[in-house]
Amino acid sequence: MSDPRERIPPGNSGEETIGEAFEWLNRTVEEINREAVNHLPRELIFQVWQRSWEYWHDEQGMSQSYVKYRYLCLMQKALFMHCKKGCRCLGEGHGAGGWRPGPPPPPPPGLA
């Protein structure tokens, strides 16, 4: 009889380093910011970052990586809800309250 337990998928041996995890986190935050500016108001993106930093880092004393993780979770949820409501941003553009004209926003503090 074969072993019923799951096998570790190739490439996921558990040998990844913590440094690779931090690199992934930084890359993913930058990628979600680049995508978010196509769908959400710049002001909202900045406010989510600022509030995440103020609460998780300044008030709760959490690490910069933890702040990025929580920010990433919030932005993923915001983009999911935006798309679930029927995103038409790339085809028809934003309606009132959506994307503001102008240059792309600067990266959130701590990510430059």
Swiss-Prot record:
InterPro entries, A to Z: Lentiviral_Vpx_assoc_factor, RetroV_VpR/X
Subunit structure: Interacts with the P6 region of unprocessed GAG. Interacts with host VPRBP/DCAF1, leading to change substrate specificity of the CUL4A-DDB1 E3 ligase complex.
GO biological process: symbiont-mediated suppression of host innate immune response; viral life cycle
Protein function: Plays a role in nuclear translocation of the viral pre-integration complex (PIC), thus is required for the virus to infect non-dividing cells. Targets specific host proteins for degradation by the 26S proteasome. Acts by associating with the cellular CUL4A-DDB1 E3 ligase complex through direct interaction with host VPRPB/DCAF-1. This change in the E3 ligase substrate specificity results in the degradation of host SAMHD1. In turn, SAMHD1 depletion allows viral replication in host myeloid cells by preventing SAMHD1-mediated hydrolysis of intracellular dNTPs necessary for reverse transcription.
GO cellular component, one term: host cell nucleus
Keyword Protein biosynthesis part of the UniProt annotation: no
Short sequence motif Nuclear localization signal: positions: 65-72
UniProt keyword Nucleotide-binding present: no
Record Pfam families: VPR
UniProt organism field: Simian immunodeficiency virus (isolate Mm251) (SIV-mac)
Family of this protein: Belongs to the lentivirus VPX protein family.
Keywords: Host nucleus, Host-virus interaction, Inhibition of host innate immune response by virus, Viral immunoevasion, Virion
This protein's name: Protein Vpx
Compartments reported by the entry: Virion; Host nucleus
